[in-house]
UniProtKB/Swiss-Prot annotation:
Protein's organism: Caldicellulosiruptor saccharolyticus (strain ATCC 43494 / DSM 8903 / Tp8T 6331)
HAMAP family given in the database record: GatC
This protein's UniProt keywords: ATP-binding, Ligase, Nucleotide-binding, Protein biosynthesis
Subunit structure: Heterotrimer of A, B and C subunits.
Reactions listed under catalytic activity: L-glutamyl-tRNA(Gln) + L-glutamine + ATP + H2O = L-glutaminyl-tRNA(Gln) + L-glutamate + ADP + phosphate + H(+); L-aspartyl-tRNA(Asn) + L-glutamine + ATP + H2O = L-asparaginyl-tRNA(Asn) + L-glutamate + ADP + phosphate + 2 H(+)
Biological process, per Gene Ontology: glutaminyl-tRNAGln biosynthesis via transamidation; regulation of translational fidelity; translation
Root EC class: ligase
Protein name: Aspartyl/glutamyl-tRNA(Asn/Gln) amidotransferase subunit C
Gene behind the chain: gatC
Molecular-function annotations in GO: asparaginyl-tRNA synthase (glutamine-hydrolyzing) activity; ATP binding; glutaminyl-tRNA synthase (glutamine-hydrolyzing) activity
Amino acid sequence: MITRNDVEYVANLARLTLTEEEIEKMTKELGAIIEFANKLSDLDTEGIEPTAHVLNLYNVFRSDEVKPSYPREEILKNAPSHDDVCIKVPKIVE
């Protein structure tokens, strides 16, 4: 059972500020989610292999293929700022 304190604790961890209505709503919704997840414990999983993925696919790669690119002029035409060779972007790191 999820309590109001549980919701407030998780909200604090996530640095969220919730209203009273949101706390009540989240308490009910998270309680319903936990209740549903607990129903999975009642399932008969005898003979079913535990898995980490739904499909048995691991490290599926595509082959590298050389394909034609857009002309540089076309790409730069759509850029808000460029120097005829590269797209200019605002500096974000000092």
